[in-house]
Amino acid sequence: MSCTPPNYRFCPCCGGSLKTRPRGDRDRLVCQKCHEVLYVNPAVGVAVVVRREDQILWGRRKGGPYQGAWCIPCGYVEWGEDVRVAAAREFLEETGLSAEVGEVLAVHSNFHDPERLTVGIWFAGRVMGGILQAGDDLDEVGFFPLAAPPVPLAFPTDALVVAELKKGKARWTSARPDR
């Protein structure tokens, strides 16, 4: 059984059966009992890009379908959580470092996993404290040159962000020099 939204069969509001019906410019899942429309929206992911001189902090995924692949430290926004608070929380969980979350560097739709569509927001970050150590979803963390990111990359959108940074389309700030 798939948990992707188009495969939902029952209404989360009342338990009634869902049917696909035209609504606006597309087909939508509509409850046959309470008539609620189930809007299928992507999850929001956040990432913090931290620079040390000409290097970026990366983390290697320790499990799941992207095990062994590298990514900019990232995670999901919880219900009711501010995106910057989520970015700082996820960064701390994955790297052991507290960060000041700054400006938005990039926003991309992530279609690489059809089971879990997301919109990602990449923020500039500055390390404020802590000890660099892999945690949560990562088994290794380290700084790599912007010109030579680690391979393989878990998420193709991280490559887009790196390309934007290389071209100067996104500005970024530095980590504290002592970190």
Residue ranges and their predicted role:
Residues 69-75:
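Conserved acetyl-CoA binding element of GNAT-fold acetyltransferases
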Residues 63, 72, 117-120, 138, ...:
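Short, glycine/charged-enriched secondary-structure capping and boundary segments
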Residues 1-65, 76-93, 97-107, 111-129, ...:
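N-terminal leader/linker segments that precede catalytic domains of diphosphate-processing enzymes
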Residues 65-68, 142-143:
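A short local loop/turn or secondary-structure capping micro-motif enriched for an aromatic residue
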Residues 1-7, 134-179:
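Nudix hydrolase/Nudix homology domain
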